[in-house]
Structures are given as C-alpha cells and as structure tokens.
Amino acid sequence: MPKYWSYPVGLAVEINNNARYGCPHHVGRKGKIIEHLHSATYDYAVSDETGDITYFKEHELTPLKGGLAYV
C-alpha cells in the first residue's frame, strides 16, 4: 500500500505537544521538514532550530503560518 504525506518537504513546522512522550525536549521547537520517510513508524524527518534532525509522525507537527518559509 502506498504511503501519502500531507505536508511537503520544506514546510515550516512546530513540534507540538503530541511529541511529549517520544521527544519531550523537542516540544515547542520550530523547524523544517527535510525528508518524507518510507517507514511504518515515522512520517517526516525534521531539522529543528538547533540543527537536530529528528523523526516525527504527522500528528506531532503543526504547520506554521507562512507556509514554505523557514522560521
């Protein structure tokens, strides 16, 4: 079964409170989607404002206003 993503690569996002169990220290950080993952566990690779690259599920990310502009 093919996998579909709602958010494009390059979209500015904020890591929301749904990530508090897997990555509590990342909650509230802003970042940019850098890759779509072909994984059953995670959907996106995100580079945050500190330079960390972390994997997240779609419900753990909130798109920022301004769309594709990195914040």
Curated annotation (Swiss-Prot):
<dbReference type="InterPro" id="IPR018591">
    <property type="entry name" value="YorP"/>
</dbReference>
<protein>
    <recommendedName>
        <fullName>SPbeta prophage-derived uncharacterized protein YorP</fullName>
    </recommendedName>
</protein>
<dbReference type="Pfam" id="PF09629">
    <property type="entry name" value="YorP"/>
</dbReference>
<dbReference type="InterPro" id="IPR038027">
    <property type="entry name" value="YorP_sf"/>
</dbReference>
